[in-house]
A protein has these predicted regions:
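Acidic donor-binding loop of glycosyltransferase active sites
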Residues: 62-76
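Short glycine/acidic-rich beta->alpha loop that forms part of the nucleotide-sugar donor binding site
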Residues: 75-78, 85, 95-96
Length: 160
């Protein structure tokens, strides 16, 4: 349903079982089935790439209009959604695990209750420049997150 709403859309997936370490081994079979299906959908704008180094991935995320991440019930933090938010990219997520803590619904993205809402909100964010700009601006103005190197220096001073 998302692709027909805008034929210029691309869904770039940078993933593989290596992305998730030991957790990835546990889910290797399922993730490989999903990625195999996704690779067959290239004509619908879906591109599957191998995992990237962190800095390279950040550059790809910054180029994105929206960050889509359904999440899982056992999600306890969701670093990828947090990183997208810090990079100023609005997210569309499902209300699993910690997603509602990562994304402020209707302010920095959408937290959806089911697949139907996920599709609807994704289309809205992709096609509505005003809503996208509002969410992007909220992310930028509230971006007071420190880099890890700065946090480490603060802790070094405290521990001296």
């Amino acid at each position: 349903e998302i692709y027909p709403s805008n034929k210029n859309l691309k869904l770039n997936i940078y993933s593989g079982s290596l992305t998730y370490g030991k957790f990835g081994k546990k889910h290797f079979k399922n993730s490989e089935i999903i990625l195999k299906k996704a690779k067959r959908l290239k004509s619908f704008g879906i591109n599957v790439f191998s995992p990237l180094k962190r800095n390279e991935l950040f550059n790809k995320i910054k180029e994105s209009r929206v960050f889509l991440y359904k999440g899982t019930k056992d999600e306890t933090f969701c670093m990828s959604a947090a990183e997208a938010q810090v990079l100023g990219v609005p997210c569309v997520v499902c209300n699993y695990g910690s997603m509602q803590e990562r994304v402020r619904n209707n302010q920095t993205g959408f937290v959806c209750q089911d697949d139907k809402e996920f599709v609807k909100k994704t289309i809205k964010l992709l096609n509505d420049d005003d809503i996208w700009m509002k969410m992007h601006s909220n992310l930028i103005k509230n971006n007071n997150h420190l880099k890890w190197s700065k946090v480490a220096k603060i802790w070094q001073k405290i521990l001296k």
